[in-house]
């Protein structure tokens, strides 16, 4: 049996941390000295040494004064002393540098506020007509951070670096939607750090340190991320007045082009309910970056107005126009579809009315209808009714119609539905149950695939892969039939040898039948928004009611590779036992949110290509037993696999009930591969 595939520990965290650290990093210079980030001490202990560098200045009094001020006041003092760009070339004193760096707080606040503001404008355009593309291009879904970073150019801080995230392309490829929803600068401090010279131990070297604490509320691939981290930015160090001037008083335009060393400490990283703080810091330990920054445009003269104007012209205005046009075209198409639907509905109503009128006049037809209702209580009765006797002919079936073909089966179901909606709904649930039991009891996925009836019913070729077979049905077969994130599948395959067997002890039940409408029921008319479909508890059970449960066991084992001890997180070192899997389906509508982008609406509808599309509400539960199962159950719980409610648009896609019933009633094939 195939080993499991990749996630969480090796790729998940870099993909999440990348864009966040991207606004802090430009490029890494491995040759730059970063020891000061490890060894520096409080400046106050070496004040005398620092004072000696700047003879004639009351450094102690000046520092005491500015340290009592807010960053805003300190930067205002700097602006008063240096009122224009030309004055920045006049030379800086130690307190000037301190006051200059204090302006970073306001610059960062203004920059992030502008990012959030522009992000809302993009959302406003999407609210006109949501973008349905899985991977929209930059013009349709601009990353505001990335775009403003590009506008800022070299030396601009915050910057986004290469490809918007400053991480390798192979990590970036799955990261296609990144937005800042809110932010908070939880801490900001400018200080002077000191360390002993590594050669002359009686001397000290000094540097300016900026500590920034940031809390960001993000949406990453439409999932919530909370990121709380601190960033240390440190200038090059100096030990004398000449060294200070070389760094901070360079001639010409270089006067405000300074080099910094940065280090990030993650306080909390929470991705879609999963706490990844420890692993994030593990990945970041001893990681330093060099930033060559232009403080004139990063702090002194932040070009936000120009950025906003350019972004408005290149993205917002174009996107608004595009979304309005798309909405107009969509509205026109919906009108056409609605007119066509009404025409077909009227035609179907006419046919049903004629059948009903004929049945009312014909006692034999009435008896056939009665017999049909009885037949709809079991799969065996259904097959017998539509393959034997004259009752089927009286209701519109012909001797040429073949129940074992998709077209014939759909015709039988449509006739049944025209006579008994609820009982037809019930027989398709029984077909779903019988088809699921039949496929889950196959001894292996290859045995299932070799069944030509399975291929015909579900539209598979005999060359299909194990993954395709597992994901074809709901519930799915074997390992690939278990709903989990692609990341977890990767991690289990990468960090361990994992085995999952075929389903055993398969059990399936449907609670009640249409005789009890509290158990099985379907609305007596086609589903409508605001009547059967909508937001919240009021609409639960309005489209249909049922409860279908399938349970089975999967023998499995996990044996982690020896080298993964510090990397594999919640993945246990060794386990062998069984996974008890339960799928529960019902007619609830998720109450947290309803909308075409977020989840499919309830649906029970015949299509022109002979399918019966159905959207159930489902919950998957997995429990490990046998061996030391605590570790596996902990892993399952951390990934919500112990109680996974299927809510997103992708996983609530409609299933075809015809496929299950067709497979359930199929005659045994005469040959297999």
From Swiss-Prot:
InterPro entries: DUF237 (IPR004306), DUF240 (IPR004319)
Organism for this UniProt entry: Mycoplasma pneumoniae (strain ATCC 29342 / M129 / Subtype 1)
Family label: Belongs to the MG032/MG096/MG288 family.
Pfam families: DUF237 (PF03072), DUF240 (PF03086)
Cross-referenced CDD domains: UDM1_RNF168
Superkingdom per UniProt: Bacteria
Record protein name field: Uncharacterized protein MPN_036
């Amino acid at each position: 049996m195939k080993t499991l595939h990749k996630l969480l520990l090796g790729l998940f965290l870099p993909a999440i941390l990348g864009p966040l650290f991207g606004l802090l990093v430009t490029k890494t210079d491995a040759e730059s000295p970063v020891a000061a980030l490890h060894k520096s001490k409080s400046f106050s202990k070496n004040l005398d040494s620092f004072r000696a560098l700047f003879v004639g200045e009351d450094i102690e009094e000046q520092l005491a004064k500015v340290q009592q001020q807010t960053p805003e006041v300190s930067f205002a003092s700097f602006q008063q002393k240096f009122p224009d760009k030309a004055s920045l070339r006049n030379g800086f004193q130690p307190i000037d540098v301190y006051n200059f760096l204090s302006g970073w707080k306001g610059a960062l606040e203004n920059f992030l506020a502008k990012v959030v503001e522009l992000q809302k404008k993009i959302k406003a355009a999407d609210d006109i007509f949501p973008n349905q593309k899985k991977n929209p291009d930059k013009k349709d879904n601009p990353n505001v951070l990335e775009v403003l970073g590009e506008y800022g150019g070299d030396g601009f801080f915050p910057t986004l670096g290469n490809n918007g995230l400053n991480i390798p392309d192979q990590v970036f490829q799955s990261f296609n939607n990144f937005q800042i929803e809110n932010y908070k600068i939880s801490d900001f401090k400018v200080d002077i750090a000191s360390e002993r010279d590594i050669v002359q131990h009686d001397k000290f070297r000094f540097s300016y340190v900026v500590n920034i604490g940031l809390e960001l509320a993000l949406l990453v691939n439409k999932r919530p991320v909370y990121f709380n981290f601190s960033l240390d930015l440190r200038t090059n160090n100096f030990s004398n007045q000449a060294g200070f001037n070389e760094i901070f008083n360079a001639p010409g335009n270089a006067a405000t082009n300074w080099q910094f060393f940065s280090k990030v400490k993650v306080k909390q990283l929470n991705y879609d309910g999963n706490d990844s703080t420890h692993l994030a810091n593990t990945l970041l330990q001893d990681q330093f970056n060099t930033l060559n920054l232009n403080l004139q445009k990063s702090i002194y003269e932040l070009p936000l107005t120009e950025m906003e104007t350019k972004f408005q012209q290149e993205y917002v205005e174009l996107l608004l126009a595009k979304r309005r046009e798309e909405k107009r075209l969509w509205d026109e198409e919906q009108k056409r579809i609605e007119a066509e639907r009404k025409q077909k509905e009227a035609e179907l109503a006419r046919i049903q009315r004629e059948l009903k009128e004929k049945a009312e006049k014909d006692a034999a037809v009435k008896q056939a209808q009665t017999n049909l209702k009885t037949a709809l209580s079991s799969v065996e009765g259904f097959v017998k009714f539509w393959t034997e006797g004259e009752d089927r002919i009286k209701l519109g079936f012909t001797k040429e119609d073949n129940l074992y073909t998709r077209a014939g089966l759909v015709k039988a179901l449509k006739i049944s539905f025209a006579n008994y909606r609820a009982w037809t709904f019930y027989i398709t649930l029984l077909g779903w149950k019988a088809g699921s039991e039949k496929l889950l009891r196959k001894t292996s996925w290859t045995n299932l695939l070799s069944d030509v009836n399975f291929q015909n019913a579900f539209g598979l070729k005999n060359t299909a892969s194990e993954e395709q077979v597992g994901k074809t049905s709901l519930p799915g077969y074997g390992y690939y039939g278990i709903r989990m994130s692609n990341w977890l599948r990767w991690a289990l395959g990468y960090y361990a040898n994992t085995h999952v067997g075929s389903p055993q002890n398969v059990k399936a039940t449907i609670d009640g039948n249409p005789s009890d409408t509290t158990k099985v029921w379907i609305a007596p008319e086609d589903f409508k928004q605001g009547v059967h479909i909508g937001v919240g508890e009021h609409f639960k059970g309005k489209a249909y009611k049922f409860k279908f449960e399938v349970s089975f066991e999967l023998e499995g084992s996990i044996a982690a590779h020896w080298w993964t001890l510090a990397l594999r997180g919640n993945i246990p070192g060794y386990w062998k036992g069984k996974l008890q899997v339960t799928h529960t389906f019902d007619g609830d509508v998720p109450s947290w949110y309803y909308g075409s982008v977020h989840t499919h609406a309830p649906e029970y509808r015949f299509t022109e290509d002979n399918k019966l599309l159905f959207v159930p509400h489902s919950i998957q539960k997995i429990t490990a037993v046998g061996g030391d199962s605590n570790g596996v159950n902990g892993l399952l719980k951390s990934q919500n696999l112990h109680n996974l409610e299927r809510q997103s648009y992708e996983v609530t896609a409609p299933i075809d009930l015809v496929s299950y019933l067709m497979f359930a009633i199929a005659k045994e094939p005469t040959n297999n591969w």
